[in-house]
């Protein structure tokens, strides 16, 4: 038996020894869900687990994030892999575990990500293997992946507390990935109660937008001709967006899905202040930017048609995610050993949702396998873990074993570093997403 195989067996045994602790943490997080940049209690739970392992801990990363390692002063020469877990919940008031005051719930499985994070840390730290690996592992609890509660996040931007609405973007900006060579995390798969893993995938990127149409109020029954109907402007704008859809190439997987968040003040008043939010999604950065230009032009046409004013505030959403082939092949080998080849799906579908793990994979290689053990579709009331072993324990074993294999092989580490060189530098990445932050205005309201 090789030293690497012996280490992996020790890691898996250690994770089994801490099985109850890992599952207890996941369920405690699930019972106390918190929204992005507000995850104080969740971070307390995660860092308390890190403390039991004797790891160095840094808190208050991008407000609520945290990281831990045996040595947080890693040199740039040391090969570093980051294991990530997301802290935040989403809002679904119908979910059975939704917070009655905020609607927050873990209907996207982030509590399972934290189990993977903590479980991997237990496996590598309690065995002492972290100190013997040829490289460094950082465990990072990341805030604010779900792109919601946006008025609160915009207030943080306006107060200078953050620049970006997404947690990983903010951590990149603050330099926490400058020295990291690659990253790994997991995600709950949809409607997969079986012990199966979809290992490879890609996702859309997107730009988020806030739109305000301003018209002129008037009595809707007695004098509508004296008003300028901002709701009509918004409806025309959305219809103009729909007229653009045939121009979007099928292979770019463009998605545009606006909602009205304010339609007026009252039925008997011509709407003068109408608000909209939307995403423009696509498979490539170029397609996101191109489709977004078309969407903004269409939205402005609605204001022009009725003589209303419009303001559009574009914010960088998330960039497209790509699975790293070198890392995922190591992960798959360990997954086959644990679950058998029939349980591993490698067909690499493209999904049209988005994640800020995409931003990470634009600057360093990364993986984001989709884990079984869950019923229901993420973000719905039906979503729940139904197999504790698959949802919380097995992923930690696979992540930890992949790390042991990866750090034991100097050629693999060199290959990953070469792949990192082909990606955006953090500086170029920040330039790219800052260019997505734009304001568009159109003034058509007459005096």
What are these regions (language model features)?
Residues 3-107, 111-138, 143-144:
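Acidic/His- and Gly-rich active-site-bordering loop/insert found
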Residues 77, 83-97, 202-214, 369-378:
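Acidic-glycine-rich active-site phosphate/pyrophosphate-binding loop
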Residues 79-82, 136-138, 181-184, 366-369:
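Structural motif
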Residues 2-3, 232-447:
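Metal-dependent amide/peptide-bond hydrolase catalytic core
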Residues 29, 83, 110, 139, ...:
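Divalent metal-coordination and catalytic microenvironments
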Residues 30-32, 106, 110-113, 185-187, ...:
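Histidine-centered active-site/metal-ligand motif
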Residues 92-105, 111, 118, 127-257, ...:
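Histidine/acidic-residue-rich, glycine-tolerant segments that coordinate divalent metal ions
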């Amino acid at each position: 038996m090789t030293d690497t195989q012996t280490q992996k067996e020790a890691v898996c045994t250690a994770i089994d020894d801490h099985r109850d602790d890992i599952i207890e943490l996941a369920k405690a997080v699930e019972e106390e869900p918190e929204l992005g940049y507000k995850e104080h209690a969740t971070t307390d739970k995660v860092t308390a687990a890190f403390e039991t392992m004797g790891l160095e801990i840094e808190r208050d990363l991008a407000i609520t994030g945290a990281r831990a390692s045996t040595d947080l002063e890693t040199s740039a020469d040391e090969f570093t892999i980051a294991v990530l877990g997301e802290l935040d919940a989403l809002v679904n008031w119908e979910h059975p575990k939704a917070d009655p005051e905020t609607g927050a719930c873990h209907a996207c499985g982030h509590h399972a990500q934290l189990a993977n994070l903590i479980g991997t840390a237990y496996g590598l730290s309690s065995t002492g293997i972290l100190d013997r690996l040829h490289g460094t592992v950082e465990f990072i609890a990341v805030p604010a992946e779900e792109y919601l509660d946006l008025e609160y996040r915009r207030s943080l931007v306006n107060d200078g507390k953050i620049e970006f609405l997404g947690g990983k973007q903010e951590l990149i900006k603050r330099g926490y990935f400058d020295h990291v060579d690659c990253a790994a995390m997991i995600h709950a798969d949809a409607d997969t109660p079986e012990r199966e893993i979809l290992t490879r995938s890609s996702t859309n990127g997107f730009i988020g937008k806030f739109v305000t149409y301003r018209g002129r109020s008037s009595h809707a029954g007695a004098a509508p001709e004296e008003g300028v109907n901002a709701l009509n402007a918004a409806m025309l704008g959305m219809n103009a967006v729909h007229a653009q859809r045939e121009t979007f190439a099928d292979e770019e997987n463009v998605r545009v899905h606006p909602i009205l968040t304010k339609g007026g003040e009252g039925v008997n008043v011509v709407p003068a202040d109408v608000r909209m939010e939307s995403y423009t999604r696509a498979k490539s950065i170029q397609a996101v930017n191109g489709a977004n230009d078309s969407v903004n032009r269409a939205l402005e046409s609605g204001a022009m048609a009725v003589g209303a004013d419009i303001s559009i505030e574009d914010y960088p959403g998330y960039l497209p995610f790509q699975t790293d082939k070198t890392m995922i092949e190591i992960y798959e080998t360990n997954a086959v050993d644990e679950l058998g080849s029939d349980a591993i799906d490698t067909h690499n579908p493209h999904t049209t949702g988005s994640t800020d793990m995409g931003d990470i994979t634009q600057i360093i290689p990364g993986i984001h396998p989709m884990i079984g053990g869950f019923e229901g579709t993420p973000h719905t009331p039906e979503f729940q873990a139904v197999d504790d072993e698959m949802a919380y324990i097995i992923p930690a074993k696979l992540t930890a074993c992949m790390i042991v294999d990866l750090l034991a092989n100097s050629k693999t580490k060199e290959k990953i570093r070469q792949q990192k060189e082909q990606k955006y530098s953090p500086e170029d990445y920040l330039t790219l997403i800052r260019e997505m932050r734009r304001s568009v205005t159109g003034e058509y309201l007459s005096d």
